[in-house]
């Protein structure tokens, strides 16, 4: 089992290095990057929900990295075929200024279902992955804590409200895949220790919980 985990970690590290070398991503024009999406007419009610958040003193704060950088994103989170709306805001007047609002479609309208709150300077990234293959996607949120640090949190919405499976672990990069071939997705997080040595943390499902299974020192530094 230990050898299988080590092989899985090496595979994930290879994937991370490949992505960093290839510069995997998308190219956008300045107009596409800085203009807000125009919602079609059928999303009028959603637009009203968004306006209520803006009128409360918030402003749009889209993720600054990765492929999902729109301030409002449509994603089927619960596997029912209907797309939830995920919207990103900052309200500087609040103790936790960074907000991720989740609106669910219901009877030709949208209702606020949940809010994820965080601290830091910005929302760094967002990814949607069904880690336990139950048909419902978890949210992997990167928070920019300061210019030198990012923190990764993983949230489940199974209960209707955000449940933090991984709580704000520092990271440089991460990858998800079914590394041990058990039908569930594992997570490998690359981070630096206090001496800036590279550490790979391996998270997997154990007894229904997403837990840190092991950590391994790697030769690369995390500068």
Mark where each language-model region is:
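N-terminal secretory signal peptides that target proteins for export/translocation
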Residues: 1-6
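Sec-dependent N-terminal signal peptides of Gram-positive bacterial secreted proteins and lipoproteins
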Residues: 7-28
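Beta-propeller-forming repeat regions
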Residues: 24-223
């Amino acid at each position: 089992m230990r050898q299988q985990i080590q092989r899985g970690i090496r595979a994930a590290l290879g994937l991370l290095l490949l992505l960093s070398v290839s510069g995997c991503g998308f190219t956008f024009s300045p107009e596409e990057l800085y203009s807000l999406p125009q919602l079609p007419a059928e999303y009028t009610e959603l637009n009203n929900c968004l306006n209520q958040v803006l009128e409360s003193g918030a402003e749009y704060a889209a993720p600054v990295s990765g492929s999902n950088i729109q301030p409002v994103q449509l994603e089927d989170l619960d596997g029912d075929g209907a797309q939830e709306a995920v919207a990103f805001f900052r309200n500087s007047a609040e103790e936790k200024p960074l907000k991720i609002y989740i609106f669910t479609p219901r009877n030709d309208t949208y209702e606020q279902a949940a809010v994820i709150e965080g601290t830091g300077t910005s929302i760094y990234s967002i990814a949607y992955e069904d880690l336990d293959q139950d048909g419902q996607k978890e949210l992997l949120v990167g928070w920019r804590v300061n210019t030198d640090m990012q923190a990764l949190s993983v949230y489940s919405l199974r209960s209707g409200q955000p449940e933090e499976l991984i709580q704000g672990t520092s990271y440089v990069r991460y990858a998800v895949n079914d590394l041990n071939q058990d039908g569930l997705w594992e997570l490998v997080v690359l981070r630096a220790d206090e001496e800036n040595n590279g550490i790979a943390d391996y998270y997997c499902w154990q007894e229904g919980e997403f837990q840190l299974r092991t950590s391994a020192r790697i030769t690369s530094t995390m500068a």
